[in-house]
């Protein structure tokens, strides 16, 4: 996976970088949410997210759960912290849409 792929997945959920507050920019100039903004967006949806570096595998793991719940609702693994954060947000948004249907 790459940051470009994670961002494509996020955009496919309807996310827009028009409000670039708390965003960085990829090599193509597209805005993507920083890990701090991703945490804010998870909180607005009623979830908490934790992003950890897994030294043994040289990767990052983002996991999330509903606030007050003991078990993770989902998790992703990626090469970098921003990539894991963006892809986690894409998966959360996709899951929320599916839950509303």
Regions found by a protein language model. Name each.
Residues 2-71:
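N-terminal segment of the canonical double-stranded RNA-binding domain
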Residues 59-98:
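Short, compact, well-ordered microdomains
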């Amino acid at each position: 996976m790459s940051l470009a792929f994670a961002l494509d997945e996020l955009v496919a959920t309807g996310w827009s970088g028009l409000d670039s507050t708390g965003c960085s920019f990829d090599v193509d100039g597209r805005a993507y949410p920083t890990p701090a903004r991703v945490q804010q967006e998870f909180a607005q949806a009623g979830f908490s997210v934790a992003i950890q570096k897994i030294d043994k595998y040289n990767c990052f793991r983002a996991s999330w759960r509903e606030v007050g719940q003991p078990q993770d609702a989902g998790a992703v693994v990626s090469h970098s912290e921003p990539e894991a954060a963006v892809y986690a947000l894409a998966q959360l948004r996709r899951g929320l849409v599916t839950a509303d249907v």
